[in-house]
């Protein structure tokens, strides 16, 4: 998801989902492809989770001179696995913690050229148990950036919940399921991120196997 700040609609600013999907599944690193991905020399990846690490390491491997993680908390509060952070550092990834973007500026062609970052400090712990990020009043910096990948979290695609009558969803928009991954509609099973929110491929596969077993049992009993 995006952060709702000025400049997020500029060329060169994209979500981690779009970036990684295009690079890994759509041959976007091929300049002759239908939708080639933009290459950046100064790439900022916003976020501190595993997806952010995937995106920033991808940018570095694609030739970025500076591939930088921008995270609003300290490194200790990063949700990414420790080994992911260490692997990123080993590849030359730079980390700018306690900073948060508040605006992006464009060049004359409408492509992002720089990011305005708010300097942050840490306050009291929030509901996640991590210390909450607090803006330092009057302190910002401007950094060059010809590409920005936003990896601050995911939200469920609203199309399915809104288009399927009678489907129970949580207040966060995820599909509510029972232990067999069956939804409020007996013919519909769900798993992965649409149930859990942002999670891992491993958990999604496990959900799929559980749902498949439940579907097989339901069909076999008829």
Residues covered by each model-derived region:
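Rossmann-like NAD(P)H-binding beta-loop-alpha module
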Residues: 28-63
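A conserved short coil-to-beta-strand element within the FAD-binding core of flavoproteins
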Residues: 1, 98-111, 120-124
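Cofactor-binding loop segments of dinucleotide-utilizing enzymes, especially the Rossmann-like FAD-
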Residues: 48, 71-74, 193
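Rossmann-like dinucleotide-binding cores of NAD(P)H-dependent redox enzymes
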Residues: 56-103, 222
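FAD-site-proximal beta/loop scaffold in flavoenzymes
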Residues: 9-40, 125-198
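A conserved FAD-binding loop/helix module that cradles the flavin
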Residues: 55, 194-222
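General small-molecule cofactor/ligand-binding pocket signal
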Residues: 14, 94-96, 116, 189
């Amino acid at each position: 998801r995006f952060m709702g700040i000025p400049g997020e609609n500029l060329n060169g600013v994209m979500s981690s989902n779009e970036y990684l999907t295009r690079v890994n599944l759509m041959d976007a690193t091929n300049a002759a492809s239908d939708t080639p991905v933009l290459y950046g020399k100064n790439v900022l990846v916003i976020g501190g989770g595993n997806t952010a690490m995937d995106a920033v390491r991808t940018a570095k491997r694609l030739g970025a001179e500076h591939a930088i993680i921008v995270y609003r908390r300290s490194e200790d509060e990063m949700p990414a696995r420790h080994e992911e952070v260490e692997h990123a550092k080993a590849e030359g990834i730079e980390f700018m913690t306690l900073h948060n973007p508040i605006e992006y500026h464009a060049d004359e062609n409408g492509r992002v050229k720089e990011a305005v970052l708010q300097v942050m400090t840490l306050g009291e712990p929030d509901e996640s148990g991590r210390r909450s990020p607090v803006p330092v009043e009057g302190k910002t910096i401007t950094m060059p950036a010809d590409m920005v990948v936003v990896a601050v979290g995911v939200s469920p695609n609203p199309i399915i919940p809104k288009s399927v009558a009678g489907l129970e969803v949580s207040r966060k928009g995820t599909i509510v399921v029972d232990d067999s991954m069956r939804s409020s509609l007996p013919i519909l099973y769900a798993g992965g991120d649409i149930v859990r929110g942002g999670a891992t491929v491993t958990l999604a596969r496990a959900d799929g196997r559980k749902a498949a077993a439940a579907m097989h049992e339901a069909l076999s009993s008829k």
